[in-house]
């Protein structure tokens, strides 16, 4: 494993066009549960399965139940960026990292100092009215009770992509641009099972595809470098 980390270190040292594509595993070391891990949200007992609650149709039909789940399970106070977030921000400041493309909704990349962050699934730190689209601070949702209402009478919702909803076209287009033009593409902390987001990596045309994940993924067989370690540990060594 030390040899593989050394190879990754050399790749990073020799490139100024790195793109990072990350998932829930990037934030687990900050105390945010991974949806699909053994201890993740999808394995915790609830009245409805989490994937049902986090769907557009459920939100429309049972907003009270959705917000109860949202405040109890998605809003986690006191979380801070970990070693992976901080090192990625450093690489951007050094002019090496061009973009962070994340499936996470926690805002920890920005908290670490990263500036060019493409949030495929939105952010729990933003909110807007589902009727008039007026923007709101997420505190209206996260620190409130019941179903938050806009002055127009519409329901205020978090600026996240729920199941059954499409990804933002502009964010996807920018992500494709960065992946397609990357010299080094590092994929970290994701099982690559969430589509359409996971399909974006197919746009990579280079020969330095790196996978950093605790467990195996469907892309391990054609990656140029695979490291099965905690992502914070790996990034602290590059």
PLM region spans:
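Conserved catalytic core of sirtuin-type NAD+-dependent deacylases
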Residues: 1-238
């Amino acid at each position: 494993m030390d040899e593989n980390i050394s190879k990754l270190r050399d790749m990073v040292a020799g490139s100024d066009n790195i793109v990072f594509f990350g998932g829930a595993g990037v934030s687990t070391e900050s105390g945010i549960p991974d949806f699909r891990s053994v201890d993740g949200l999808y394995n915790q007992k609830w009245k409805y399965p989490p994937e049902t609650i986090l769907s557009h149709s459920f939100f429309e039909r049972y907003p009270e139940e959705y917000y109860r789940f949202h405040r109890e399970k998605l809003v986690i106070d006191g979380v801070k960026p970990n070693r992976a977030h901080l090192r990625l921000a450093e690489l951007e400041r050094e002019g090496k990292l061009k973009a962070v493309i994340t499936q996470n909704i926690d805002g920890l990349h920005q908290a670490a100092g990263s500036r060019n962050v493409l949030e495929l699934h939105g952010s729990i730190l933003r909110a807007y009215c589902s009727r008039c689209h007026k923007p709101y601070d997420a505190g209206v949702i996260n620190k409130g009770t019941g179903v938050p209402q806009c002055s127009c009478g519409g329901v205020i919702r978090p600026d996240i992509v729920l199941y059954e909803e499409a990804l933002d076209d502009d964010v996807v287009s920018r992500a494709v641009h960065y992946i397609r033009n990357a010299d080094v593409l590092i994929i970290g902390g994701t099982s690559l099972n969430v589509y359409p987001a996971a399909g974006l990596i197919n746009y990579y045309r280079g020969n330095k595809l790196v996978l950093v994940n605790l467990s195996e993924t469907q892309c391990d067989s054609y990656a140029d470098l695979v490291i099965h370690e905690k992502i914070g540990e790996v990034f602290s060594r590059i």
